Amino acid sequence: MSVPTKRRLSFDESTNKRFLNGTHSTENNTSNIEVDEDYGSDGSEQIFDLPATTNNNQWQETITKVVNAVVSIQFTHVSNFDTETSLVSEATGFVVDATRGLILTNRHVVGPGPFCGYVVFDNHEEAVVKPIYRDPVHDFGFLQFDPKEVKYLQLTQLELKPDLAKVGTEIRVVGNDAGEKLSILAGFISRLDRNAPEYGSLTYNDFNTEYIQAAASASGGSSGSPVVNEDGDVVALQAGGSTEASTDFFLPIYRPLRALQCIQKKQPITRGDIQVEWQLKPYDECRRLGLTPEAEARARKLFPNKIGLLVAELVLPQGQADGLIKEGDTLISIDDIDISTFIKVDEILDENVGNELKFVIQRGGEVITQMIKIGDLHSITPDRYVDVGGASFNNLSYQVARCYCIPVKGVFINDASGSFEFASYEKSGWLLETVDDMPTPDLDTLIEVMKMIPDCRRVPITYRHVSDLHTENIQIIYIERHWQSSFRLAVRNDTTGLWDFTDLQEKPLPPLSHEPQNAKFIDIPFSDETRSGCSSLVRSFVQVRLIAPVPMDSYPYRKEICYGVVVDSVNGYVLVSRRFVPHDMCDIFLIFAESIDVPAKVVFLHPNQNYAILKYDPSLVLADVKTPKFGDKPLKRGEKSYFIGYNYNLRLVTDDVKISGVSSLNIPPASLSPRYRGTNLECILLDSKISVECDSGVLADDDGTVRAFWITYLGEATCDQGSDRMYRMGLDVTDVLSVIEKLKVNEIPKQLRLLEAEFTSVTILQGRTRGVSQEWINKFEEVCEDEIKFLAVERVSAPTLHQEKNPLKAGDIILSVNDIIVKNMRDLKPMFTEQELKFRIIRQKKETEIVVPTIDTTTINTSHVVFWSGAIIQAPHYAVRQLMERVPSEVYVTRKSAGGPAHQYGIATNSFITHVNDVETKDLVSLMKVVKDIPDNTYIKLRLMSFDNVPIAISLKTNYHYFPTSELKKKEGSDEWIEIEHK
């Protein structure tokens, strides 16, 4: 698959921005806004800090009137759609019809997709708003609120007077600049004829309109602000600006005024277009493109205040003007009306949708007349999308087609996730061409194709990126519709302001049964006969493919490919790193000899040694899969071994290696988002480049006896908080033999126990300083073979709400367990089988003996997940308790959806919900008992506790239409997950 390349940005594209104040769909982003909640709340007269001018009194009266009509818009785009991603943000709008509750703001605020929001008036009254119109091209839209919701403020409206925008006019931009409650920015209009700014590729851009330019230094949050003159009339709409100067761009309000009048008259807002992008070019450039002197003279006489004419910049293939108008053509007239501005073009086209009009152009000095049928802009503006397989699709929009000069047709992937996640770095911009060798020219066809594909089916697809249409990408994808069960059509409803959902298929077709298949392994060739025993070890490797669509236990990855080792080919068991298989809410496929794939499931997750056991049906694999011979003695420093494994390109690698060390260690925790990691490990280290190149493998003797598994551990870089790091080390076979022996008799080790503490190595000097006697030092010197050290308690895990805290304390030095000297992590093995252990320790320079209980690990893995208000909630998994002293509740927020109520109202990831409406929520059962009775669109009070035990109180408004409540739960006494939906 090729890497898509972006087209080079123009100067405008790289320096212009829209003035939202908020965040996009990246996880954990929240709006970084400081708002003075007490502003103007005392009812006293407001004082505005205005620049010194000769008419301050007039401006004072004007601003006093204007601020009552200006609102702060707090909104969220709840899902990806077309060019826009999910986000939570704020902007500005203003009332243009107080009777009907109409608010004018920017189109990029209203957004092309699902919108939820409310407005806050100057006196801090709040009203829910719904979108009723967003223009297909120009940067304006309308929201509507119920005027009855505003009880304490006398509603006022601002008048739209586009003709009053003149060069030199003094203006004020009244809005929420930089997220502040109210900002008033002063400036003067300097231009009326600027071409629309470009904000970049694959995002919304206005075009085919003039923009007004001024220097007002507005920033985030001011989008949608009214630009008013001294009399308080709105002359333009704030839309964007330059990041490298104080320049602001205002939208002329001729089209917003017409749209408002249509809404007031309950008439449709017709919008016409011929799929041509025009640019205003100065006369000198028009001459170079072929404008005749006679035509220039006539235009200058008709329009003495204009500096140029409209020139075709882009003509879309298969559009109304394709083949009739060409790039570089100068527009002279439409329907015998001379043209010099976009304003007149809009007026003519909007009133003639479906009609054929005469266009007169000049091309190379020649006058050409073309009859062109006016198209409907609304018909090429998508108002539907489909969710299926964890991804989202809509018909290709005019916005994207114009950006890349392609026909307005095809299926556009606005959220390439789930089954359709092609590249983690690019979630949007893909055009889907075929699925399972069936063409998908439009959304309706895609729906029918997806209905025919069974669940868990691998199918070929072809697709392209809009930035690299020369390259056709072909990929085999796995259609998963049981974890991500939604297959629905969303249709925009401008009456309710919501998007109406229709389920397209109750259940997918059942998975096809797997048949036994043949495969052949190619043994590793060796010229050295002494290593012939290693040749067949390739038959013990199997490729593991994991799909984990739900980010349970804070696991950051959704798709993984690695290699595992078959530890029992007769019963079908595979050992794999928990870096790649962190939990059992996933789909797993094993690929043998790069030829056949069979499904597998997780049957065992070791709580601390970083490996998982997978089970497959060996009868499906007609190949010579081999169970290797396992050694029974641990590897030691200095021993030579032979490495066989796979690098990050999934290629087989072999090398002679030497054991550089065997260390007692813990994988560094991810402090920002705790997730599973290996602890209390005895790890094998290599002095070889293999140690950084290979994720999976084995260390073997010359005769093929496997001495260690080479696996990957997920942790955090110790010098860079928040940065993932992969630690690649060896796990000695002797640490796994007890589990392998049980697997040979088809017994899954379910009754494993665990000591809830982490240990670290300390030197003899440190131990001596902290109170270890010479007698004990002598004992350690007698029994230690490689390195003389003590183990000390690094941290003790927080107990669950139903447990007593572990009596061990951080800093305790361990001398013996059950009267056996503890010289390394392996000496802690009794914790896996014993209910309690007798520890002899040094605490505060005193030797003492304590009894430490172990815990049953049968319930340590997550078995219940709640999806509520856009938050993924579960009991705090073990990695969380490892880093805490006390757990505030068993209701832990592990992740949140971008654009959901949890994101909008500030529920932090890694926080605990302790109360809902002042009712204590100790666990998920009590949480569900409370929230199931809370109506939709209702404010509730939440009390949270941060990961650092800082209490927080917030309010949240439910939104079950877009974010319904559901659960994933394991059946009682079973490993099967079931979905529970709450309507």
Swiss-Prot record:
The keyword Signal does not apply. It is an enzyme of class 3 (hydrolase). Coiled coil: none annotated. One of its GO terms (molecular function) is serine-type endopeptidase activity. Its main location: nucleus. GO terms for cellular component: nucleus. Nuclear serine protease which mediates apoptosis. This is Pro-apoptotic serine protease NMA111.
